[in-house]
């Protein structure tokens, strides 16, 4: 008896289907199609720490404390944490970077889970403090939460408000000094006090305990002396670093597994 090739193929496929159904019935389990490697893997997005520089300072100027803090964090968190610094004019660029980091499945859009899994910390000095709040507001429109914002002698830009912290921010802190032609805002407030905790508005006075800030440009030390002193104050950045670390993954102790 002769069988066509098409008939044999159909017969083989039917036999395979009967076998699969039989195995499923015996085990009580439905046999699912096998996934390709990585199909159900959803990697966790990194924690994100972004800093903004004040004035017209370059994003990688090593003299400035914001850049130094970022370098220290990169050294101690080589994986699992994305640390970057930006000029205060690059809020939109920083937002795009965040969207890229959160898109863990690389499908070009953020799911609710990807948004809610965000762990974002933003800090900045002077106009960088304004940029900190501006980025947090942009992320609020995207439905993305922010763990912490840190403003150091924050100065509003072009009359834009940098004192009202958006409701997507969990915690916010403000360090300021009130002297000189350029000085920070003395009081930040939560747009929604039930969702945002203001850790404090902390005032600093460098008249009694002046700082040299020898590495900073002479014009900063001359024209905006107090504003520069708060930026180069190691106490400020030690406090900021402590708050940031509290919201980052714990570094395993040496020798631990």
What is the role of each PLM region?
Residues 22-25:
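C-terminal motif of bacterial Sec signal peptides marking the signal peptidase cleavage site
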Residues 58-66, 87, 91, 124-132, ...:
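Solvent-exposed, acidic/flexible segments
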Residues 167-257:
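C-terminal catalytic-base region of ester-bond hydrolases, centering on the histidine
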